Amino acid sequence: MPYFSRLILFLFCLVVLVESRKPKKRRWTGQLETSKPSHLYKKNPDMTKIRHGKPQPLLRVDDHDFTMRPAFGGPAIPVGVDVQVESLDSISEVDMDFTMTLYLRHYWKDERLAFPSASNKSMTFDGRLVKKIWVPDVFFVHSKRSFIHDTTTDNIMLRVFPDGQVLYSMRITVTAMCNMDFSHFPLDSQTCSLELESYAYTDEDLMLYWKNGDESLKTDEKISLSQFLIQKFHTTSRLAFYSSTGWYNRLYINFTLRRHIFFFLLQTYFPATLMVMLSWVSFWIDRRAVPARVSLGITTVLTMSTIITGVNASMPRVSYIKAVDIYLWVSFVFVFLSVLEYAAVNYLTTVQERKERKLQEKFPCMCGMLHSRTMMLDGSYSESEANSLAGYPRSHILPEEERQDKIVVHLALSNESSSSRKKGLLKGQVGLRIFQNTHAIDKYSRLIFPASYIFFNLIYWSVFA
């Protein structure tokens, strides 16, 4: 037993000796200690590497229920809106829509976001805070597509003032429907509207209004379109009613566009006018040149058909007549009538030649007098040639006032043996002179067609321009 007590005492002394030889640990003080204290080696602490405690948040977002609107159960919360239009990107006649890029800003007051501030300065946040607080649920009525820009981050800004006033701004591109009237196209003006409205809150919960009236809408002076002249931007507001939900405040961004006519003058009106004028060349071509006049008429008709097809391909299929349709189809009718004019001339020429052959077969002794008479009336032969063929020498050409009577008397004396043949001859060559003289139809067409087309243009441009 004494031996065991001695052993325990020995072990205890050994443990005390070992513990006394270990170095003592020092607490970290954040100060750099050196063996040689000097101001050359003294360093200030790096505050970026010092761990701070969690600061007390100024906006107590977690202390409130932001699923409810501000002042829930009370009067409607007023939400002011202003818009700055950055660009009007495109206008589509086929789809009847427009694309616009704009800055949309909302203003309202939420006392739950009020915070103490000695300097009365606001705090600015990005889009991450938007998901934690209440914001107005404004959407674009009749919108087809829209998105918030996200380069390089979501283009959303939230600014909160100490008294709870909130500014909520975002950059949006929206494509919306525009009801267009093309009855005066391309001499038309179009008025389009971008409409804003709360999706869930009626006018009893949310009062949407333009913050500064007409001054709430600002536009960039550099906005321009290739086919349109932007005439006016203005704002309006009214109530919209839905039978299942009630009345809603709706804001309108209205703008008026007037189409540039110069592009369509070059692409549509000028080519159509040239085709009509080209069809008139047929009236100066000899009526016996069938291939030339027929090919010219067919070419102008097909070209007009191509112009009409090209214009309609770039337009919506509306159920009413457009101004450009009137011009193109009237021009097409003029071109087509020039083809019909030659068809009539060619037919009458064929009928006339057939009658001449029959008369020559009945009266072979006329020695070419009837033929010479017809040729002179047609204008295909000169005066001296006609009189020479009729038996008159060149030295006996009569004055103008006696020439017609002389020739008629000559023909009448040649056929006085038969009263029936005399009546038929006078009826065929004097009574129907204009209708048998197919050259006269071309002569009258040279005046009637241009005069009618010019008259049509005067009426058209005075009505639609």
Swiss-Prot record:
Give the signal peptide, or none.
Answer: 1-20
Q: From the Swiss-Prot or TrEMBL record, what is one GO molecular function term?
A: GABA-gated chloride ion channel activity
Q: Name one GO biological process term.
A: chloride transmembrane transport
* Keyword presence, Protease: no
UniProt xrefs under Pfam families: Neur_chan_LBD, Neur_chan_memb
Q: Which GO terms describe its cellular component?
A: chloride channel complex; GABA-A receptor complex; intracellular vesicle; postsynaptic membrane
The record's section on PROSITE patterns has: NEUROTR_ION_CHANNEL (PS00236)
Which residues are exposed on the Cytoplasmic face of the membrane?
A: 282-293, 347-444
Annotated positions binding 4-aminobutanoate: 105, 169, 197
Q: Which UniProt keywords apply?
A: Cell membrane, Chloride, Chloride channel, Disulfide bond, Glycoprotein, Ion channel, Ion transport, Membrane, Postsynaptic cell membrane, Signal, Synapse, Transmembrane, Transmembrane helix, Transport
User: Which reaction is this enzyme known to catalyze?
Assistant: chloride(in) = chloride(out)
- Membrane topology of the entry: Multi-pass membrane protein
The entry's free-text remark on domains says: GABAARs subunits share a common topological structure: a peptide sequence made up of a long extracellular N-terminal, four transmembrane domains, intracellular or cytoplasmic domain located between the third and the fourth transmembrane domains.
Q: What does this protein do?
A: Rho subunit of the pentameric ligand-gated chloride channels responsible for mediating the effects of gamma-aminobutyric acid (GABA), the major inhibitory neurotransmitter in the brain. Rho-containing GABA-gated chloride channels are a subclass of GABA(A) receptors (GABAARs) entirely composed of rho subunits, where GABA molecules bind at the rho intersubunit interfaces. When activated by GABA, rho-GABAARs selectively allow the flow of chloride anions across the cell membrane down their electrochemical gradient.
- Family label: Belongs to the ligand-gated ion channel (TC 1.A.9) family. Gamma-aminobutyric acid receptor (TC 1.A.9.5) subfamily. GABRR2 sub-subfamily.
Q: What is this protein called?
A: Gamma-aminobutyric acid receptor subunit rho-2
Per the UniProt record, the lineage of the source organism begins with: Eukaryota, Metazoa, Chordata, Craniata, Vertebrata
Q: Which gene encodes it?
A: GABRR2
